[in-house]
């Protein structure tokens, strides 16, 4: 008989360098005093994101597990999510009372999606530095994720990106689906992500 609770599993995806790990660090630090949290990171050949989160003090080290996927990062979160499912189950059993487990995908493209067996909610992170055209390119990450984060808004003037254009295209590509602009260096947009997780994940507001 299962003697541990099933946590809410939140998948966090997005291209390399978009700010997935920075978002996870910020989420963990903001939520850890109110909820029981753990993280599973995915890297192809290393456990670099696990190391970054651990050294940043996002959570206690034993709450952060790194998975080396090898090969294509899409497969490890979609077609064959067995390594990630095993890591999630191991963490849930170890702590018994986990309420949220974040699963960070390896760097991927706009077509990557999480298996519904692995993630109850999905957050997709893109960044302004990739260009204002990214939202209108579509792909499941843009159109199907439960929540979209457009990060690094502070870079817009330097890359010639119009936030107004990005907002218009985002609203067109994912009507009725929530999203936010963010500048995680300053904490901008973070609360919108937390509110989404708490509300959609039915966690209950605390703190």
Curated annotation (Swiss-Prot):
Top-level division of the source organism's lineage: Bacteria
Entry keywords, A to Z: Chaperone, Cytoplasm, GTP-binding, Nickel insertion, Nucleotide-binding
Location in or out of the cell: Cytoplasm
Annotated positions binding GTP: 14-21
Entry keyword annotation includes GTP-binding: yes
Alphabetized InterPro entries for the sequence: CobW/HypB/UreG_nucleotide-bd, P-loop_NTPase, UreG
Molecular functions (GO terms): GTP binding; GTPase activity; nickel cation binding
GO cellular component: cytoplasm
SUPFAM superfamilies per the UniProt record, alphabetical: P-loop containing nucleoside triphosphate hydrolases
Pfam family, one: cobW
HAMAP family cross-referenced by the UniProt entry: UreG
Family (UniProt): Belongs to the SIMIBI class G3E GTPase family. UreG subfamily.
Subunit description: Homodimer. UreD, UreF and UreG form a complex that acts as a GTP-hydrolysis-dependent molecular chaperone, activating the urease apoprotein by helping to assemble the nickel containing metallocenter of UreC. The UreE protein probably delivers the nickel.
UniProt-recorded name of the protein: Urease accessory protein UreG
